[in-house]
């Protein structure tokens, strides 16, 4: 299987006419399916996709790695553009998120159409050769910057972790 990954938005910019922001959004094209990995902090990924000639209406899955605003800030914008993609994420995506003491989570989660969400709790194959891993243990906390990020769950602060996808290609 051949996979093409196109950066729609991230911190640096190398394409003429494109813009960057603190955030991430990648388009993953397997040839059979299109997956959007995160939505950046705003609708900027949509503008960059238009410049690159990418039709986001053709995306089959939106995979949200975690609930921080720089990865989910464009969620509402994407759902307005694409009416078919299944949104894949951990159930904890909507728990309150913080960076230090500042709120940093999904904006207006109550306004979202919950029927489009697929919550994953274990390793799941989304489409042929593409997997999501919702629970990855942190083996070396000193090698991360997670000490600044936490979620509020079960009545207490907890470390905030991510969802990862991989393929056999």
Where are these regions (language model features)?
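Active-site metal-binding loops of divalent metal-dependent hydrolases
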Residues: 10-11, 39-42, 67, 92-93, ...
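Short, glycine/charged-enriched secondary-structure capping and boundary segments
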Residues: 20-22, 51-52, 77-79, 101-104
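Flexible, acidic/histidine-containing loops and adjacent segments that form or flank the divalent-metal
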Residues: 85-102, 106-155
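Divalent metal-coordination and catalytic microenvironments
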Residues: 28, 38, 49, 66, ...
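Active-site metal-binding motif and surrounding structural segment of the metallo-beta-lactamase
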Residues: 44-92
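Pre-active-site segment of Zn-dependent metallo-hydrolases
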Residues: 18-19, 33-61, 151-153
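Zn-dependent metallo-beta-lactamase
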Residues: 1-32, 127-163
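Conserved small/polar residues in nucleotide/adenosyl-binding loops
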Residues: 165-169
